[in-house]
Structures are given as C-alpha cells and as structure tokens.
Amino acid sequence: MILLNQRYYAMYEHHPSFELPENSEEKMIWRYMDLPKFISLIDKKSLFFTKASKFPDPYEGTIPKHNEVVRRTIYEQVKPEFESDEQFDSFIRSVPKIFGSILKQYRELMLINSWHFNDYESAALWELYGKETAIAIQSSINELKDSFTKTTDTIWIGKVNYIDFNHEWMDEWNIHEAFVIKRPSFFYESEIRAITCLPDDHIDKNISCKFDVEREKKPISPQHSVDPTELTTHGKYVKVDLNKLINKVYLSPAAPSYFKQVLESIISKYELNKEIIKSDLYTLK
C-alpha cells in the first residue's frame, strides 16, 4: 500500500498463483485496440478489466477435461484419510459439482486485462484488430506494475499457460490457476494478464475471492466496495497513471497517412506527450 493525498491506495501485488516469465520485468508488452477504446483509455485514465464470464472463449475459468480422467488416480494419495471406500467414492463424485459451482461464481468475480508479451509487434494481432485505425500501446511489465498507483484495487499480474485440456492436469485445488490457462489454439496471443477481483457483495455471499483451500498458496483477499461509476455489467475500469503505463503508441501498418496527425491532436488535448509511430511491419526496407 502507498499513501497518496492522505488516502491509502492499493497497487500491484505479487501472488504465487500468478507467475511471470523469468527475468521479464523489462520485457515489452503490447495492448492492441481500436480507436474508440484508446480514446476511452486516455479519457478515463483507466484500463478496462473484463469479467472472466464475458470472454468469448467458453473454456475461460474452467477445469480441463483431463482432470475428470485422472482425478481418482491423483486423489488416491489422500484415500487413507477417508473412513471407507464408499466415502472416498462419494467424494470423487462430488468434486466436479463442488468446483463447478465455485468456478461459476469466480467467473463473475475475476476481472482480467490482457496484454501481449513479445519483443516485437504481432502480425496476427494487427490482423485481428484489422481496421486501419487500430492502435497498439507499447509498455513493459514493470511499467504496467508501476502504473497502478491511483486505484484502491489490488492488482496481480501473471502469464497465461497454454495447455491441452484433453491431456493435461490442472491443480484444481488452486482455483486461481483456472484463470491463467488457455488451450494451445490461443498460443499466438502470448498473453500476460493483469487481474483483480470484485468484492464479495457482488456475488453469492458463500463464495468470494478469499477461497483457496491449498494452504501454501496465498488467498486472494476481497476488495473494497466498488465505485458504481467504475462498474459495468462486463467488468470495471481501473485507474492508471498513463505516463507510467504508456511507453510508445503504434499505429496499424494499414493506417492512412493522415491518421498520425489525427492521433497527435487527440493525445495533445489530454496533455499526453508520447511518441506515435506508424508500424512499418509491411514496409520493405
């Protein structure tokens, strides 16, 4: 926590469930967006964190199918703690329902802001955002961490691991892991996630971000009450220091010649002095 204007603010906090690539603090990260989202960012001075339940991937925040296949084998080591085989069998049968219920609630609580981890621009992501007015913010993991100085939210940052849901096990006792795994089809995203959590009063009182039965893992604490002006049905806005967050602003390689001047005019109105570079990804040198 830091003290700012006589008020305590939360900021980036390490959490063992959310790991970063080794020696990655100075590595570049990118956030691709269209022009309206960029204007929203600089106007609100906030990053938008989306509820996990609102992501288009239906596997977001779920347990891999392979867990069902190997669950009994994995839990055999704790079988002696049960009074009978019947009790153990009952436990195994109950696990999918228990975790299914918890994850359903977590998908509403966990809020995610996605970044691309790469030393270079991504041709795939330029194509995905495709329009001539697409924009990419260049930052670094350290700059992202340092930008969360104007919020009461605690922010965690971690890399996404790409696993085969049909053949790989996820530690289901660490529920948080479900929000940093994706299928290999998304590997091109090379995703880094900033993550925060809604307070308990936005969901079932029996489930909150405090839940974590794996003792050696640090629980996620519930957050402060949310300013209703920051909250939407899809997530919430989190205040950031734009001067710390943004290193450079890149324009789409397909951007028309006048677009750089338009963007310079826009950011000057917000007193944001950042270099604007048109991508030369498709320029023969």
Protein language model annotation of sequence segments:
Residues M1-K285:
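Partner-binding and oligomerization surfaces adjacent to conserved cores of proteins
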